[in-house]
Every structure is written in C-alpha cells, then in structure tokens.
C-alpha cells in the first residue's frame, strides 16, 4: 500500500520543467541583492567611522608649519582619547592627552571651524612665554618643532604671555576669552583651568591659538 500511494503522488505532482533562462535570471537577482547589502553595510560603517573613529581633514593654514603644510591631508583618530571616566574606557585603548600631541578641535567661537594645534599646557600647569620661550611650571620647554619666521607683524603676545592685567585685552584677543583667561592669571603665569588644555601652533608667528 505505501508503494502505491507514493506512485500516485509522483504522478499527480510531476517534476516542474525549468524554463529557459530562469536559472540565469535568479542568479542575477541574487548578485544584485548581495551587492546592495554590501553597499549598505559599507555606507553604515563609513558613517559610523567618520562619527566615532576616524575623520579626514585638510590643513587650511600655515599655523603648523613646518610640521604640517598647507594642503596636507590628515586622517584623524577620534577614538583614542576617552576622558569621560566611563567604566568601559578601561577595556578600550583610550589614553589621556599628553603634552606634544597634535590635536584637531572645534574653534570655541565658531563650531563650524576646526583648528589643528599642538598641546602645550595640561590642566593645572603654570605657563608663561618669555621672549618666545615657553616655560611650564618654572622650567623651559624644549620645542624643536617651534618655528619663528619673523614675517608676521609684531605682536606682543607672541613674545611674552600672559600680558599684564592692565594690558590684558588687546585687539587680537577674543573679548570672551580675555575675560575668562584673566581669572587664571597669577603673577606672570597663567594656570591652565581644570579639564582645559593650552594649545599652540608650531609656527608661532602665524598661529591663532590659546594665546588669543
């Protein structure tokens, strides 16, 4: 009996014949679907990467010469600095900012602008410039990367910093920054505020940086 039933089923459901080109058409659809899926994954990873991991920048000015030249392209690691104190930072390759690091950051008075500078002062550091020499906590800072081309117009902030309180606001300084910075001047030094960093361009005569 089982054999007869099997035979009847086979007779009622004969094997479907494949139409010419059907296999090829199905294969084309599969290839297109796989391509679109791969493209979607690539776009998602690219968006994630530029938001959280890396981002490309182009040097717009001479403020970091001769370390970085106008037109140089950078791929910036946005992932390396943690700083939030979250527990997971201990499990990931985060590190704190260090003196000498080159950083890209948003200009405080115009969020659409990005600046490229070098970290000079860390939170709590006592900093001053005397005749263009940087002193940190009373010791001269060795800066083989610093350039003084002398081509820019004379600017007292490029030679001695911070200025005396009576001369603190100059035409070159942002008024908001001058007012804020005045609170951290002690004698002839400025104390870098908590959670803040003092950054300068390597080309000291042509850099709009933390002095301003």
Sequence positions of predicted segments:
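Soluble "head" domains of membrane/secretory-pathway proteins
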Residues: 2-32, 52-58, 63-212
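Hydrophobic membrane-insertion alpha-helices, especially the h-region
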Residues: 37-52
């Amino acid at each position: 009996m089982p054999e007869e039933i099997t035979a009847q089923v086979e007779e009622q459901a004969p094997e479907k014949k494949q139409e010419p080109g059907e296999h090829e058409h199905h294969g084309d659809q599969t290839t297109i679907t796989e391509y679109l899926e791969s493209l979607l994954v690539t776009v998602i990873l690219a968006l994630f990467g530029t938001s959280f991991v890396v981002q490309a920048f182009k040097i717009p000015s001479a403020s970091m010469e001769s370390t970085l030249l106008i037109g140089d392209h950078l791929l910036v690691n946005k992932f390396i600095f943690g700083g939030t104190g979250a527990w997971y930072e201990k499990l990931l390759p985060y590190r704190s900012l260090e003196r000498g690091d080159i950083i890209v950051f948003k200009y405080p008075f115009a969020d659409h602008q990005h600046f490229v500078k070098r970290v000079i002062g860390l939170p709590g550091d006592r900093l001053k410039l005397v005749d263009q020499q940087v002193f940190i906590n009373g010791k001269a800072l060795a800066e083989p990367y610093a350039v003084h081309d002398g081509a820019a117009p004379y600017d007292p902030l490029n030679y001695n910093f911070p200025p005396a309180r009576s001369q603190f606001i100059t035409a070159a300084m942002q008024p908001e920054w001058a007012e804020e910075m005045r609170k951290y001047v002690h004698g002839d030094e400025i104390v870098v505020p908590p959670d803040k960093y003092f950054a300068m361009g390597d080309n000291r005569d042509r850099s709009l940086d933390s002095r301003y």
